[in-house]
Amino acid sequence: MIKLNFSRELRLLTPAQFKYVFEQPLRASTPEITILARRNDLQYPRLGLTVAKKHLKRAHERNRVKRLCRESFRLLQHELPNYDFVIVAKHGIGKLDNPTFTAILSKLWQRHIRLAKKSLSN
């Protein structure tokens, strides 16, 4: 049975881990959200989130975005390549409703899966 947990080991925790992804990322983006990715040496993907107060003033709005991102990652973690992912929220993300937001995330995850397969074949 596949475990769909989101434990501590599946998260990017330190500034150095985030910096590693920001140095040479693969990007998939929409006007509201960007997912950056970079290959890691582990056997599983990891996730980091950046949601600035500049784009979402209220804490409950930032928490909603982070919760939806974590849930999306948790459900797809076994399909994703062994990359470190950083989700960057941009202006206008707060205006999206939950179904639209999850659809956008799903599309971006699929794009990263395709990019990873393409880079493996090269």
Curated annotation (Swiss-Prot):
Class of this enzyme: hydrolase
Top-level taxonomic group: Bacteria
Catalysed reactions, as listed in the record: Endonucleolytic cleavage of RNA, removing 5'-extranucleotides from tRNA precursor
Oligomer and partners: Consists of a catalytic RNA component (M1 or rnpB) and a protein subunit.
Family, per entry: Belongs to the RnpA family.
Database matches in NCBIfam families: rnpA
Protein purpose: RNaseP catalyzes the removal of the 5'-leader sequence from pre-tRNA to produce the mature 5'-terminus. It can also cleave other RNA substrates such as 4.5S RNA. The protein component plays an auxiliary but essential role in vivo by binding to the 5'-leader sequence and broadening the substrate specificity of the ribozyme.
Protein name according to UniProt: Ribonuclease P protein component
Organism, scientific name: Mannheimia succiniciproducens (strain KCTC 0769BP / MBEL55E)
